[in-house]
């Protein structure tokens, strides 16, 4: 299996499929690169090179005790980009992976980046505070960590239902998918799982958003109960000049599965022609409800 080594020696597993302009897929918490199995085949078939890696501590990557802050995670992404010598790449970040996109570009620049996509992303910040009064209270994340400490399998099983809107949004999500999600999540180290809750909940990305100088697509579920849209995508879209903002009005957080019939075509349109080619779908303020 292919691996790259990061600055501190942590080995990251990655998948590398196809040829053409690179698309780097950055998974969300608490999953790994396999979450992209419903997007990767369509991207490869359309002529793109798809690289999907496991974040440190997750999936098949090494599980160190430290390094789960966003500076280190962004440096890990840089190690991958440099080792594979990727240029004109599109960075696609889902959920906490959107934070890596933002921090990578603000920390390392956009010389290797042609465009960016934020899907259900935590940017520009989730935690409630003076600069984010409508954010998520710290107690919510404290309860998540306590649940992980107390009974991680049970917590992850319950979390998976909210993740896909099962039983809440009338989505038909199979028991097999929920079991797969929990199994993938359990591959991660408990240290990484809890440390990343702290990272994605407490990190303020407002200062990173100015780095989005490349064409950017923002996609979010209007019914996302995991990463509420009003404290994330609605704010991010106002901070990224000329971003194309797509809201899947009734979609949950796990829209890479529930709404793949909308997500995949939107990705391909954006990749194929950039933000200009897709701009006819904008409404006032750049926001489109679909």
Question: What is each model feature region?
Answer:
Residues 6-66, 80:
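Conserved HGGG/HGGXW glycine-rich cap/lid loop of the alpha/beta-hydrolase fold
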Residues 27-29, 89, 93-98:
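Conserved alpha/beta-hydrolase "nucleophile elbow" surrounding the catalytic nucleophile
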Residues 71-89:
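Conserved acidic catalytic loop of the alpha/beta-hydrolase fold
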Residues 102-107, 111-150:
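Flexible "cap/lid" loop of the alpha/beta hydrolase fold
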Residues 127-136, 147-210:
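Conserved alpha/beta-hydrolase catalytic His-Asp/Glu region
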Residues 212, 218-220, 224:
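Short beta-strand/loop motif that positions the catalytic acidic residue
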Residues 225-231:
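Conserved alpha/beta-hydrolase "acid-adjacent" motif
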Residues 242-290:
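Catalytic active-site module of serine/aspartate enzymes centered on a nucleophile-bearing elbow/loop
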């Amino acid at each position: 299996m292919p691996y790259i080594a990061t600055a501190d020696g942590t080995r990251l597993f990655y998948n590398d499929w196809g040829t053409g302009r690179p698309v780097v897929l950055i998974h969300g918490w608490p999953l790994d690169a396999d979450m992209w199995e419903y997007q990767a085949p369509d991207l490869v078939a359309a002529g793109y090179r798809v690289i999907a890696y496991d974040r440190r501590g997750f999936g098949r990557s090494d599980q160190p005790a430290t390094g789960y802050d966003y500076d280190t995670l962004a440096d890990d992404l840089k190690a991958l980009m440099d080792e594979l010598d990727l240029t004109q790449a599109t960075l696609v970040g889902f959920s906490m992976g959107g934070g890596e996109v933002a921090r990578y570009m603000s920390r390392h620049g956009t010389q290797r980046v042609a465009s960016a996509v934020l899907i259900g992303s935590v940017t520009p910040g989730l935690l409630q505070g003076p600069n984010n009064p409508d954010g998520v209270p710290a107690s919510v994340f404290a309860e998540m960590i306590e649940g992980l400490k107390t009974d991680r399998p049970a917590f992850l099983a319950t979390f998976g239902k909210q993740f896909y809107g099962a039983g809440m949004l009338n989505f038909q999500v199979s028991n097999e998918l929920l079991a797969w999600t929990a199994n993938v999540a359990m591959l991660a180290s408990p240290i990484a799982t809890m440390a990343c809750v702290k990272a994605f909940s407490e990190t303020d990305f407002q200062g990173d958003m100015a780095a989005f100088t490349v064409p950017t697509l923002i996609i979010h579920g209007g019914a996302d109960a995991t990463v509420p849209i009003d404290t994330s995508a609605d704010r991010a879209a106002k901070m990224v000049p000329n971003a194309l903002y797509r809201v899947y009005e009734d979609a949950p957080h796990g829209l890479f599965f529930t709404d793949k019939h909308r997500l995949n075509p939107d990705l391909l349109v954006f990749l194929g022609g950039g933000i200009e080619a897709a701009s006819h779908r904008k409404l006032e303020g750049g926001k489109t409800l679909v």
